[in-house]
Swiss-Prot record:
EC number: 2.8.4.3
Gene Ontology CC terms: cytosol
Gene transcribed to yield this protein: miaB
Name of the protein this chain belongs to: tRNA-2-methylthio-N(6)-dimethylallyladenosine synthase
The MTTase N-terminal domain, residue ranges: 4-119
Record organism: Nitratidesulfovibrio vulgaris (strain ATCC 29579 / DSM 644 / CCUG 34227 / NCIMB 8303 / VKM B-1760 / Hildenborough) (Desulfovibrio vulgaris)
Family as reported in the entry's similarity comment: Belongs to the methylthiotransferase family. MiaB subfamily.
Length: 449
């Protein structure tokens, strides 16, 4: 009997995390067993190439895998995700232990390929072709109940081709998933215990607006999913500001289970830089969307992505981004220094900034964001919210057990409960007692349900 142990390492976005979760369930249904790093025969690396740093981490990890499995002569590696799509079969020559490379559309066929590789030790395979339609996967939920908070893919790829972004080249052109299939997966998850669903896509607002769509708009999809029995909370990521429709904005005011938090990537606060980036909106348009969202749902919380040091960014441009953070008052922003991505338009732009300038600006921006985040969390003190409890907190309570979960605004909340409480996957009314740097401390204010 061949060794069928596996271990998965994941880099990058929530879509990658969701892909890895599906792959793990699919492998276990085929008789594979999870094992710790360095002990598994098969190590799968699900990669990200949005920035240079995670790509370099992949190469470093492959070196560590080679060392960790040096005493397992039959050990091998599968590399998936965006770096696999980008580098392709080049992995075979650079890293001999790699025997499978699979792209984002090839994921659906990866379990069958790994079955073959376990049985045929001299075989190497690549699954790098983009499919014409959404690459539908086997419905694999695993054994027992599913987590209370789950993710559902609604589309693959992107047609925006922002100047800095490699995603359209590594995940392919946009392909919307069939509405009926999405709803079927949501129902199955709810039947197995899910209570919160997050819809995933590179640009969810353009769902259905491609040759693979069935005429359903994203706003219509939101209403269909929100109406499913048993769904207590609904979220989605990631929208593009240029495509956000009035009907989506209105949904925040009309759908009671649509959570009042939205990740709305700005990328830069300078109109000149936004134009160079190819974002196809300006600050005036973005701020109108923010105003409309707050009119529809006054308590909505916003977060963003910010790129610091885009080619040609002046100090004045950067200060406009800083002003934008203050004006919007983001609860959080995911900020990073610009890095060239191969094949993108921005790679060819002149006036690249030095690493020192980019890092100095990033530090200033993150200092400002930390202050804004602390202010947003402080505003929660004294409020009563319901927390979906995910598990035990790493920080033990002074008395009893300490649990953690998320409130409707996406804040991480820690709460002390009597020892032995069985509340995983349940909602708990709490009153926020204290704001920490990146989380909240709360006290129980009602019975779990």
């Amino acid at each position: 009997m061949h060794d069928r142990t596996f271990h998965i390492e994941t880099f990058g976005c929530q879509m990658n995390v969701n892909d890895s979760d599906w792959l793990a369930r699919a492998l276990m249904e085929r008789g594979f067993s999870p094992a710790p790093f360095g002990e598994a025969r098969l190590t799968i690396v699900n990669t990200c190439s949005v920035r240079d740093k995670p790509e370099q981490k992949v190469y470093s990890l492959l070196g560590r895998i080679r060392q960790a499995t040096s005493k397992k002569p039959d050990a091998f590696v599968a590399v998936g995700g965006c770096v696999a799509q980008q580098i392709g079969s080049g992995f075979f020559s650079r890293f001999p232990q790699v025997r499978l490379v699979f792209g984002t559309d090839g994921l659906a066929m990866a379990p069958q390929a790994l079955d073959r590789l376990v049985e045929e030790p001299d075989l190497k395979l690549s699954l790098l072709d983009f499919s014409e339609d959404y690459p539908e996967r086997d419905a694999v939920l695993g054994q027992g109940a599913v987590p209370a908070s789950v993710f559902v893919n609604i589309m693959q790829g992107c047609d925006n081709f922002c100047a800095y972004c490699i995603v359209p080249y590594t995940r392919g052109r946009q392909k919307s998933r069939a509405t009926g299939t999405i709803l079927d997966e949501c129902r199955a998850l709810l039947d197995r215990g899910a209570r919160e669903i997050t819809l995933l896509g590179q640009n969810v607002n353009s769902f259905g607006q491609d040759s693979h769509g069935d005429g359903t708009t994203f706003a219509q999809l939101l209403h269909k999913v929100a109406a499913l029995p048993g769904l207590e909370r609904l979220r989605f990521v990631t929208p593009h500001p240029k495509d956000i429709a009035p009907e989506v904005v209105e949904a925040f005011g009309t759908l009671p289970n649509l959570c009042p938090r939205l990740h709305l990537p700005l990328q830069a606060g300078s109109d000149r830089i936004l134009k160079l980036m190819g974002r196809r909106y300006d600050m005036a348009r973005y701020l109108r969307i923010v105003d409309d969202l707050r009119a529809a749902r006054p308590d909505i919380v916003l977060s963003s992505d910010i790129i610091v040091g885009f080619p040609g960014e002046t100090e004045e441009d950067f200060m406009e981004t800083m002003d934008a953070l203050e004006t919007v008052g983001y609860a959080a922003s995911y900020s990073f220094c610009y890095s060239d991505r191969p094949g993108t338009r921005a790679e060819m732009l002149p006036d690249k900034l030095s690493r020192e300038v980019k890092l100095e600006r990033l530090e200033r921006l993150q200092t400002l964001q930390n202050r804004l985040t602390e202010r947003c969390l402080q505003d929660m003190v004294g409020r009563k919210v319901e927390v979906l409890l995910e598990g035990m907190s790493r920080k033990p309570g002074d008395e009893g057990d300490s649990w953690q979960g998320r409130d409707p605004y996406g804040n991480l909340v820690n709460v002390a409960l009597p020892q032995g409480s069985d509340v995983r996957g349940r909602f708990l009314p709490v009153v926020v007692a204290q704001a920490k740097k990146h989380s909240l401390l709360a006290e129980q204010a009602g019975a779990p349900w």
